[in-house]
Amino acid sequence: MQLEFLGTGAGSPGKFRNVTSVALKLLDESNEVWLFDCGEATQHQILKTNIKPRKIDKIFITHLHGDHIFGLPGFLSSRSNQGGSEELTIFGPTGIKDFVMTSLRISESKLSYRIKFVEIAQEGVLFEDQNYIVNVAELDHRIKSYGFRVKEKDHPGELLVDKLKELAIPSGPIYGQIKQGKEVTLDDGRVINGQDFIGKPQPGRVVTVLGDTRQTPNIELLAKDADALVHESTFGKQEGSLARNYYHSTNIQAAKIAKQANARQLLLTHISARYTGKLSKQLESDAKEIFSNSKVVRDFDIIDIPLP
């Protein structure tokens, strides 16, 4: 599991940062990539990575400001032109379907795959399959903005092979039945319960990705015990009043939330173009004074999220 940042800037593309987009790469786990936001030129950024557009089968849109969605029509068209045929699901605020379909209709773009739209109607569970569960909650921005909490389901415990060998239970297909937790009758007549030979489940990982927001209690709920918290940092520590007036956050506010939520790492993004060079480093060092595992991410940074 990895996060790859395709755009880390705020508002408009800059010389050093493109507008917002981050990929959650689940290639080893489920051979797919999820995209969070798709700002202008996201498809150009993808060309500079090893991400294959056809592997992206889910896109989560935090809110409908242009720096988070203007790249969608182009990406969707290119995915089709490059042979993408698998269905793609777009999750987002009410209006995302209208934006996408209007763009495709007016440009007379034809796609080779089906798009499924899930417009967010309420907070809570947004998506669930056998591997993951995604919760969504509303944030505090000038328009509807959301945060997403991706929870990987727990991994089954390992088969306790040494314990089986101690009881002279021979290896073979029977181990597969035992690992499934089944009750098994051995050739010698012994009956064993597979549950007794399975270790404790390994907790799944949690990734929290937030849209633009002022501080709100929902952030801590989404970020609780997260292995990675992706939080906007449009402003620095001296600009709290500006952040509030413009419905954004500072690096210090993000760091305090990460600490309160017991997150493992804080990844600061949505960085204003005013913060370059030393000023960008200062954003990070100020955040680290409160939450030591803070990082101001740059375009194309890749963050590994190992199992606990």
UniProtKB/Swiss-Prot annotation:
Keyword Zinc: yes or no? Answer: yes
Q: Which residues hold Zn(2+) 1? A: H63, H65, H141, D212
Name of encoding gene: rnz
- Protein name per Swiss-Prot or TrEMBL: Ribonuclease Z
Cofactor requirement: Zn(2+)
Q: Where does Zn(2+) 2 bind?
A: D67, H68, D212, H270
Provide the alphabetized UniProt keywords: Endonuclease, Hydrolase, Metal-binding, Nuclease, tRNA processing, Zinc
Instruction: List the catalytic residues.
Output: D67 (proton acceptor)
Q: What job does this protein perform? A: Zinc phosphodiesterase, which displays some tRNA 3'-processing endonuclease activity. Probably involved in tRNA maturation, by removing a 3'-trailer from precursor tRNA.
User: Which Cys pairs are S-S linked?
Assistant: none
This protein's assembly is summarised as: Homodimer.
Q: Which family does it belong to?
A: Belongs to the RNase Z family.
Q: Which InterPro entries match?
A: Metallo-B-lactamas, RibonucZ/Hydroxyglut_hydro, RNase_Z/BN
Q: Which CDD domains would you find in this protein's record?
A: RNaseZ_ZiPD-like_MBL-fold
The record lists the organism as Pediococcus pentosaceus (strain ATCC 25745 / CCUG 21536 / LMG 10740 / 183-1w)
Catalysed transformations (reactions): Endonucleolytic cleavage of RNA, removing extra 3' nucleotides from tRNA precursor, generating 3' termini of tRNAs. A 3'-hydroxy group is left at the tRNA terminus and a 5'-phosphoryl group is left at the trailer molecule
Q: EC number(s) of the enzyme?
A: 3.1.26.11
Annotated cofactor note: Binds 2 Zn(2+) ions.
Instruction: Indicate the enzyme's highest-level EC class.
Output: hydrolase
Q: What is the lineage of its organism?
A: Bacteria, Bacillati, Bacillota, Bacilli, Lactobacillales
Q: Which GO terms describe its molecular function?
A: 3'-tRNA processing endoribonuclease activity; zinc ion binding
